Swiss-Prot record:
Matches recorded under SUPFAM superfamilies: ATP synthase (F1-ATPase), gamma subunit (SSF52943)
Family classification: Belongs to the ATPase gamma chain family.
Localization per Swiss-Prot or TrEMBL: Cell inner membrane
Example of a GO biological process term: proton motive force-driven plasma membrane ATP synthesis
Protein name: ATP synthase gamma chain
Source organism per UniProt: Sphingopyxis alaskensis (strain DSM 13593 / LMG 18877 / RB2256)
Principal subcellular localisation of the protein: membrane
Described purpose of this protein according to its UniProt entry: Produces ATP from ADP in the presence of a proton gradient across the membrane. The gamma chain is believed to be important in regulating ATPase activity and the flow of protons through the CF(0) complex.
InterPro entries (alphabetical): ATP_synth_F1_ATPase_gsu, ATP_synth_F1_gsu, ATP_synth_F1_gsu_CS
GO molecular function: ATP binding; proton-transporting ATP synthase activity, rotational mechanism
Domain of life: Bacteria
Bilayer topology annotation: Peripheral membrane protein
Subunit record text: F-type ATPases have 2 components, CF(1) - the catalytic core - and CF(0) - the membrane proton channel. CF(1) has five subunits: alpha(3), beta(3), gamma(1), delta(1), epsilon(1). CF(0) has three main subunits: a, b and c.
């Protein structure tokens, strides 16, 4: 059994840890409000842009003059998985869930005879993916030191991904990130990004005749790169909100667990102290009787 000094030391240590986790929970809660507002503000624009691109794509179809980001390379042998992670831990299963979704997709593609490459954003997913898929990380985007990752970083990432696409490094690109639902729920999500996938259902028609100037293909040539950037930007914002939500929940759980452990250790400490006092009293009484 641990001594009173050891028990007291453990209680002090756990209380110190509890103060840290409580402070981190409060910081995450403050950051969550800002990140959630940014993610929710970006969703309508990103979804509307996807709808416009899908509508134009359905009109252009697979014509020979269609932009490459729409028509594709004509094959689907090599797939690039763009995986968005964070640089920090203490966020529960936030990073591991994204890596798991990307891993499952990679294994599925490899079982079909496809070649899989990875473009990684953030540090946390690198060790696992490097171990599971050695030699398949084509590039890494370092976010170390970036306080609030945003549109500038999304533009750099999308520009590099499209550069690799034009160079023939891959045929299909998928984006993996965590979709924010609430502080308690974040969903690891994967979606095809390049070439633009056909809409799940035919775009709704308003009944009005629409003419495009200079033309659908020219407009698509301008919108498609922007759409790639916006989808990555949306993923980064969703990730930021998801990370703070997961961190707040994890720190709340850690704070409550620390409280429970403190209570248990305090009970053990009091029982041990009471037993020691009782033993001393018995020894004193026995000594007095001997006299």
């Amino acid at each position: 059994m641990a001594s009173l000094k050891e028990l007291k030391g453990r209680i002090v240590s756990v209380k110190s840890t509890q103060k840290i986790t409580k402070a981190k929970k409060m910081v995450a809660a403050a950051k969550l409000r800002k990140a959630q507002a940014a993610a929710e503000a970006a969703r309508p624009y990103a979804e509307r842009l996807e709808g416009v691109v899908a509508s134009l794509a359905s009109k252009v179809g697979a014509s020979d003059s269609a932009p490459k980001l729409l028509s594709g390379t004509g094959k689907s042998d090599t797939h690039l998985l763009v995986v968005l992670n964070s640089d920090r831990g203490l966020a529960g299963a936030f990073n591991s869930n994204i890596v798991k979704a990307a891993r499952d997709k990679a294994l599925e593609l490899q079982s079909q005879g496809k070649k899989v490459l990875f473009y990684l954003v953030g540090r946390k997913g690198r060790p696992v993916i490097a171990r599971l898929f050695p030699g398949q990380i084509i590039e890494q985007y370092d976010t170390t030191g970036i306080r609030d990752i945003g549109f500038d970083q999304a533009s750099e990432i999308s520009a590099r991904v499209m550069e690799l696409y034009e160079a023939g490094a891959f045929d299909v690109a998928h984006l993996f990130y965590s979709k924010f639902r609430s502080a308690l729920l974040q969903i690891a999500t994967g979606q095809q990004m390049i070439p633009v996938p056909p809409p799940a259902e035919a775009p709704a028609s308003s009944g009005a005749a629409v003419e495009y100037e200079p033309g659908e293909e020219e407009i698509l040539a301008d919108l498609l790169p922007r759409n790639v950037t916006i989808q990555i930007f949306k993923g980064l914002l969703e990730n930021a909100a998801s990370e703070q939500g997961a961190s707040m929940t994890a720190m709340d759980n850690a704070t409550r667990n620390a409280g429970e452990l403190i209570n248990k250790l305090t009970i053990i400490y009091n029982r041990t102290r009471q037993a020691a006092i009782t033993t001393e009293l018995i020894e004193i009484i026995a000594g007095a009787e001997a006299l």
